[in-house]
Amino acid sequence: MNQVSFNKVRLSLAVLLCLCATSMVNAKVKLPALISDGMVLQREQPIKVWGTADAGESVQVKFLKNATPTGVKGGKLKATYTATADENGQWSLTLPAMKPGGPYILQVNDIELKDILVGDVWLCSGQSNMELPVSRVTDMFRDEISAYENTNIRQLKVPNIFNFHAPQTDLPDYVAWKPLTQENVMNFSALGYFFAKAMYEKNNIPVGLINSSWGGTPVEA
């Protein structure tokens, strides 16, 4: 093989590798920010899992505890749940209802989400009275707040952003579930904080708060 032919072969291989790499990147499954490490799922209700991928791509979902399928209300999870992305790249599937517990692992193709709990999930929506953070009430409840931590209570704060062109289909990538620790507590909704504490003391199961509050906004927002 002469040098010119050899260089052509190398160039062809390089182009092929680039195309394969691009295909792999495009085919990567993406989950919404709500479905992420540390999330809390609603107990004893069917659980929807959704996301995006290349049109026609097969998506496999496993829900695990200690590398084995966990028990669920009324039976056991199947080893694998599957879905296929539609022509717009959208896919979804439903897991069966589960009892409270955790932590669990959720595997979606090559994505692995850890530290997942099953308990009660509450939407904390409203105006400034719901938005008011714990940091604003520490003068009145300093001792109580500084003495309490509970990683079975978690909050996801929906950021105050808006889109005047179309409804939002996802949250920014930086949005994450945060456990109730001294590091995170000041950003919890104060009303949500005391409510979650009371609910945990009553039921002794994980509590998830989705804090979607914004002062001065109407309820339809």
Show which residues each predicted segment covers.
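Intrinsically disordered/low-complexity terminal segments and short unstructured peptides
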Residues: 6, 21, 67-69
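Cell-envelope and extracellular/periplasmic
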Residues: 28-221
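Bacterial N-terminal signal peptides
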Residues: 12-22
